[in-house]
Structure formats: C-alpha cells, structure tokens
Amino acid sequence: MFSHIMIGSNDITRSKKFYDALFAAMGAQPGTEDARGRLAYSHNGGRFMVTKPIDGKPASHANGGTIGFVMKDAAQAEAMHKAGVANGGRSIEDSPGVRPHGAYLAYLRDPDGHKLVGVAR
C-alpha cells in the first residue's frame, strides 16, 4: 500500500542509535544515510525513513498517529520494545502484552515523541 513512511527528527544521530537498535531487534539491518542525511531502513518489504524537516522547522510527532511494525511473534515485539526503551525511547500505554482482540502489542515513543507499536498477530 505504501512506498515508504518518513518521520522527522531533531537529532539524526540520536535517531540512528534508537532505530538501529529497534530494527536489529526486528531482524533488520542498520539504517543507511543518504547524501541529504536521511536514514532509511528496510523491513518486511517496506521502507521507513527518518529526516530533519525540509522546511528547517523543528520536527514534531503526529498527535493521534501511530506507526505499527509487523512482528513475527510476541518475543520479537517484546525485543523491539526493550531495545527501544534501552536506546532513548519510553514505554507508553499498557505494558506489552496480548490485547482483547488477540494481538500482542508493544507501544513506545521514540526520542522525538513518535508513537510506535510492534504488532504480532
């Protein structure tokens, strides 16, 4: 459905540390940086990118927005969550676990405040 998802960051070096750890927990490679300083990650056929805003204004998170990553199982979702928290993210909402609809969800925010979730169905 999407070619990529791109989010803004106020500190690309901090974001690289955070997302490299997050994607490693998902079994993906570290991000690559292009000539413009944008980070790119590949996972399950999709691309996730991080950049400083092109307009030069501070990056901000989407109020009401969530970026969900497909996990192969609950253990991978838990590993993603732990890696994120250990690298500057913070756990949010309920603790990682199975929700009433049967999916295992692990919510956290990245260092810039973007809401992320690892989802194992």
Locations of the language-model features?
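Absolute protein N-terminus
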Residues: 1-2, 121
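Vicinal oxygen chelate
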Residues: 3-10, 59-83, 86-121
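Core segments of cupin and vicinal oxygen chelate
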Residues: 7-48
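Hydrophobic pocket/interface hotspot
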Residues: 15, 19, 77, 84
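A structural feature recognizing the 12-helix transmembrane core of secondary solute carriers
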Residues: 29-34, 38-42, 69-70, 80, ...
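Short secondary-structure boundary/capping segments
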Residues: 40, 56-59, 98
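Conserved, structured core segments of small domains
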Residues: 48-54, 103
